[in-house]
Amino acid sequence: MFQVLKFCWKVLCFIRDLVMNVVFLGFVLLLVAIISFSSGGKKSTALTSEGALLLNLDGYLADNRDETLRWQDALSELNGEHVPRKISTFDVVFAIQQAEDDPKIKGLVLDLNYFEGADLPALDFIGGAISHFKDAGKPVIAYADNYSQGQYYLASFADEIYLNSIGSVDIHGLSQENLYFKEMLDKLAVTPHIFRVGTYKSAVEPFLRNDMSAEAKANMQRWLGEMWNNYVLSVSENRNIKKDRILPNAKQYLAELKALKGNSTAYAQQRGLVTDVVTRLDLDKKLSALFGKGSDGKANLIEFDDYLTQLPDRLEHYNVPNKIAVVNVEGTIIDGESDEENAGGDTIARILRKAHDDNSVKAVILRVNSPGGSAFASEIIRQETENLQKIGKPVIVSMGAMAASGGYWISSTADYIIADSNTITGSIGIFTMFPTFENSIKKIGVHADGVSTTELANTSAFSPLAKPVQDIYQTEIEHGYDRFLEIVSKGRQLSKTQVDKLAQGQVWLGSDAFQNGLVDEIGSFNEAVNKAEQLVNQRQDTAVQDFSVEWFTDDNVSLISTLLSDTKKGAQEQLVKWLGLPAPIQKLQKELNILTKFNDPKGQYLYCLNCGKVK
């Protein structure tokens, strides 16, 4: 009788889940149809006369484009919430480049009020496009009510910077802080079994210590200090002011602010950080005088999103004979398929194989923006880049904000590596982490017991890890580290001894990595394109004049699966909001959430935990 009831209950649960999923899917399809219909009927704003491009970046920058922006915008409109958007850095640069040659576009306006900032390499890339735009004789104006450090860095590329009359410029330097869990694990009686190689492999320190080791701190202080020097130097050159005008020491800063009776707006003016202070109305009058008025009586501007819809799609593929394929590897490298935040080894390998099989593809640019992740998935990706090289297709790596640990593993054997001066790279090291809870469950009166045929059979999380098993894990990790050294040695044409001195988990900034031979050139994505063309022509009797740069993406990803993934992510974020968790608890949850991304089949990771938190 019990079995019958159990079976009936399972059937009812299945029917319930099926009905709920069908209803939800129907709702999603209906909403997509409504969005498509409404956007199809809505005409894109276009300049009817000469005006300026308004670069109103409402959100944060990433390499990959969010294909569900209309969906996200519609949901934001429905629930009345402002949700920051994911904006592709490459779309921004593409729009600026097109505007430079557009006779109707007479200038560029940076509205940075809702821009959430980005890493310095992305800002440098956009800044380079802005500088080129200015060289064409077109003015660039930047405005924000208040400037964060990242917003101001981008604004510094403009001809003129305007600040609201009660605004401020928040430049404070760079810092990085990690959470450490050893005491918490001790209180919970969790035993973390850590197997690693590398003096500076700080990825696992949070589970072994309550503070940062002296070696990790020295390494971080070096590259963080260099990054800050690069920030100050760039702003100084862009604004044509002395470096010591950017940020004085704390004592001098306070003295100047007190002398101005705490007026941070006047302080920004006095330091030469802004051109002038204005009200919003004053700014519109100034822009109207420069670019004319539109039909609404305001300055004649076309918004970034509207302008982008009038341009050819950057992701469009064309039937041309000479292509340079671009493949993005963005986020933590995981085993399996990619999602919105992670780069799946199987997905990236499939895209690279597509470029391999396409005879029109002459070279591949691997765009890497990753702190690493699964050792297995990283090697699957690297093997596909080698397959491209074996058939004569050069592979050029363009590093973004970071290409560390697994991100460097997949880069190291490329034909040529280009990094930004502020790219975080290196972190050559490997680890395995295996926690056991035998003491935790004892505290609540639970015990684990059983039998095994050998000492190696029981790797339960509720039993102590046998010494032979621990020795096996450590031996495999040491082999993994040696393999890392071999790969880098082969790819960079350095001895293993030389690589080992640069390895041990040390993090390097792009400029130092260049000096040490870990990268070939300091430059942007544009230099990667130029190098790809050069390498192709070096291998051919007849030089190719025209190349088509095309982004290769995964054909297997459907809009519905992306929408469902985004909906799930949004629901998780909404749950955190509804719970009303304090900010420190939310930060703790995010830190620990990193562990959920770890899915390597052998539990081996090439990951730089400390590479993405500079603020």
From Swiss-Prot:
The chain crosses the membrane at residues 18-38. It comes from the Bacteria. It comes from Haemophilus influenzae (strain ATCC 51907 / DSM 11121 / KW20 / Rd). CDD domains: S49_SppA_67K_type, S49_Sppa_N_C. It is an enzyme of class 3 (hydrolase). Residues 1-17 are cytoplasmic. Its EC number is 3.4.21.-. This is Protease 4. InterPro entries: ClpP/crotonase-like_dom_sf (IPR029045), Pept_S49_pIV (IPR004634), Pept_S49_SppA (IPR004635), Peptidase_S49 (IPR002142), S49_SppA_67K_type_N (IPR047217), S49_SppA_C (IPR047272). GO terms for biological process: signal peptide processing.
